[in-house]
Amino acid sequence: GPMYLRFTRDAIPQIYDEDAEFVIGKANQLKEGKDVAIIANGDTVRLALDAAKELEAKGITARVLDMHTVKPLDTEAVTACINEIGKVITVEDHNILNGLGSAVCEVAAEMGKGVVKRIGVQDQYGQSAPYERLLAMNGITVENIVKTAEELQ
């Protein structure tokens, strides 16, 4: 079926072992937590994991999911985050409209509960800059994830 791949020019840290398995439509839970869920994909997964470490030092535990497949979305994993935690942050290096954040918001809306905060590119024209600078310009940072999680507590 249809698919797309996105690549950055910069080298990114390796999160998975070479023998890691991925199932289309099934998120990979990388960390357990009970205070907030952080759902990310692509390179932003490393930011989510780094934010979870910082949050843990502040007494806030974060469940981190790598939602490597946006369509089909792992609605079971999203539903579990909303039912068990109720507070979700999505992180993506993509427009917050019609991406991971929107898909998670649709699940929460159908359920009629939960709070979802989206971190990503706002609905604006893109800019040109080095990758890390673009992330910072759009608030896609460890600091912003931590701040957002703290505001949800």
Placement of each model-derived feature along the sequence:
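Divalent-metal (often Zn2+) His-rich catalytic cores of metallo-beta-lactamase-fold enzymes
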Residues: 5
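Thiamine diphosphate
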Residues: 8-153
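Amphipathic alpha-helical interface segments
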Residues: 1
